[in-house]
Design a protein with these regions (language model features):
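Structural/interface elements that position substrates and couple domains in central-metabolism enzymes
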Residues: 2-444
Length: 444
């Protein structure tokens, strides 16, 4: 294990009650709370190095499926789950399993509330469950993405309601998840793990734990720095995507091929990273996490994080821009959008996964329906899909549909799609991903 530290820990590290495994009659090394796209890969990696692991999830269908050897996460196969089960992994809905663990890692969702602010309900609920089962010597780690200060200001007080003190009796740390669904090159083991402890002894415990199955640990000064690091990563992507999205809109008005400009700029070997226009941002991270940072700035400092909020405004309006371009394309072909049959290709938020969270295909569909278009979809990874509770028809014969529909919009460039064939077959094709540059194909 390689460890990179921001600064030396110093000569003095306060003792932390019982050290790992001493005085604690835990039957397992790890309990993972939340067995979704973050928690399940974490459990798999821990099991793969011989750790005894249990999982806790509120969804009885998820728990039953895992205990039957079935995965519900793209990056974890059924075979992976069966091997985990053979190694002793068990999923539970009862939080009694937590008191058996030396380490508890919280991997629950952190969505937005109805007013657009942070919704820490799942984190608070999970922390209370941990506090109710907390034992001297345990390590608790929060991996859920959140604003700086959450670990110290929300999680720590709840844990200490148990009567145990963080840094003295138990260890508490924050380590942001860096899971990239569908990425086969950079998995949990290969991706450096940022870790920040509430105290130096907490950091040592967390570094030691993750070092068992992650190749490189990056130790932050504390939990706030680790929390900010994750928000910085996602906000960086968010604002750069917004930049190229607005450039795409501007370039069209200026009669500039933005895709060629990006290609040329991308040849610079230093000082530039290429981002590309899209029909909007999706997934649980990019559309959500910058809101947590904006909230913290407004609530703690009393002013707006203008850069982030402008990026949100630009990215949120991209589905509207896509539909407007689609309408213009149909009008140029002599058809109104009203009553036209529109086929959406690829409705997941990223290529080659089945994840529909925050997909821009949803607002695109909603806007097309508002304009009385007849919408259907095709996606090799999605069998059924609905928007606002209304099912979107799925076409079975893609070749026939390409010929029959008035307009085809490529929203996601899954590798299963034969792009030249799409261009040759579709009557009218709008490529929002910049993948098909052929005469007759409209590109975002």
């Amino acid at each position: 294990m390689q460890v990179e530290r921001t600064q030396p820990l110093g000569d003095r590290i306060e003792p932390l009650g019982d050290t790992e495994g001493q005085g604690l009659t835990g039957e397992v090394e790890l309990a993972v709370i939340g067995l979704g796209y973050v928690g399940l890969p974490l459990a798999r990696e821990a099991v793969s190095v011989g750790l005894r692991v249990v999982g806790l999830d509120l969804d009885p269908h998820v728990v039953a499926g895992l205990n039957s050897g079935r995965s519900h996460v793209d990056d974890v196969s059924d075979d992976d789950v069966r091997r985990m089960r053979e190694a002793g992994f068990t999923a539970y809905t009862d939080d009694a399993c937590l008191e058996r663990a030396q380490t508890v890692v919280i991997c629950v969702p952190t969505p937005l509330s109805d007013d657009g602010g942070p919704d820490l309900g799942a984190v608070i609920s999970a922390t209370r469950a941990v506090a109710g089962r907390l034992r001297r010597g345990q390590l608790v780690v929060l991996e859920s993405t959140t604003y700086p200060g959450t670990t110290e200001e929300v999680v720590r007080p709840l844990l200490e309601e148990s009567g145990l003190r963080v840094g003295e009796d138990v260890a508490l740390a924050f380590s942001p998840e860096r899971i990239d669904p569908g990425n086969t090159r950079h998995g949990l083991r290969e991706t450096p793990k940022v870790v920040g402890g509430c105290t130096p002894s907490c950091a040592v415990r967390a570094v030691t734990f993750y070092g068992k199955f992650v190749n490189m640990i990056v130790q932050a000064k504390g939990t706030r720095e680790a929390e900010m690091a994750k928000l910085l990563e996602n906000t960086y992507r968010h604002v750069n995507i917004a930049l190229v999205n607005e450039l795409a809109i501007i370039s069209r008005e200026l009669h500039v091929d933005v895709w060629d400009a990006i290609r040329c700029a991308g040849t610079k070997p230093f000082g530039f990273q290429a981002f590309r226009p899209s029909p909007g941002v999706g997934g649980h991270c990019i559309p959500i996490d910058p809101n947590y940072l904006s909230y913290k700035v407004r609530s703690s400092l009393g002013y707006e994080f203008r850069f982030v909020e402008l990026a949100q405004e630009i990215n949120r309006r991209m589905p509207e821009y896509v539909v407007r371009r689609a309408q213009d394309l149909l009008n140029t072909a002599g058809r109104p959008l009203h009553g036209s049959r529109v086929l959406l290709l690829g409705v997941t938020y990223k290529p080659d996964v089945a994840d529909l969270r925050e997909t821009p295909a949803e607002p695109v569909t909603r806007l097309l329906r508002e304009r009385q278009a007849e919408v259907a979809f095709h996606d090799p990874h999605v069998e059924r899909w609905s928007v606002d509770g209304v099912a979107v028809p799925r076409v079975g014969d893609l070749t026939a549909a390409l010929r029959e529909y008035d307009l085809t919009i490529l929203l996601q460039d899954h590798s299963a799609y034969d792009l030249p064939t799409l261009a040759d077959t579709a009557g009218l094709l709008f490529d929002t991903r910049g993948r098909i540059f052929k005469p007759g194909v409209e590109v975002l």
